[in-house]
Regions:
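S-adenosyl-L-methionine-dependent methyltransferase catalytic module, highlighting the catalytic core
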Residues: 1-6, 13-108
Length: 108
């Protein structure tokens, strides 16, 4: 596969099942690139929310939590990762949406 896109998907997966999704996408499909977006929970204060952004979200990550997850995935499955924000950036809470671009590292 050339690429996989998980746009606003991972937060809908029950945490105990997240490892299966990770393995299916990064381990078995193993595309050259994977694009992942997910809400930034820190930004929820701008929406005056208590809790998750939507009722069907199983979790929402802070920027640090998302970064830790992306780095775990990159090390485990051999991908480089770049992190970005999508939407208006607030200096204290970051952007509303987090964006990771994974690219498969090629062995020399």
């Amino acid at each position: 596969f050339d690429a996989a896109v998980l746009t606003e998907v991972i937060e809908h997966v029950d945490p105990p099942r997240l490892a299966a999704l990770e393995d299916a996408v990064f381990g078995h499909a193993a595309p050259a690139a994977v694009l992942v977006t997910t809400p930034n929970s820190e930004y929820n204060v701008h929406y005056e929310l208590e809790g998750l952004r939507h009722d069907d979200h199983r979790f929402e990550w802070t920027r640090d939590e998302f970064a830790a997850w992306t780095h775990k995935i990159s090390e485990l499955y051999g991908y480089a990762v770049r992190l970005h924000g999508i939407g208006e950036h607030d200096p204290e809470t970051g952007s509303p949406t987090q964006f990771a671009i994974f690219t498969r590292e090629v062995s020399a």
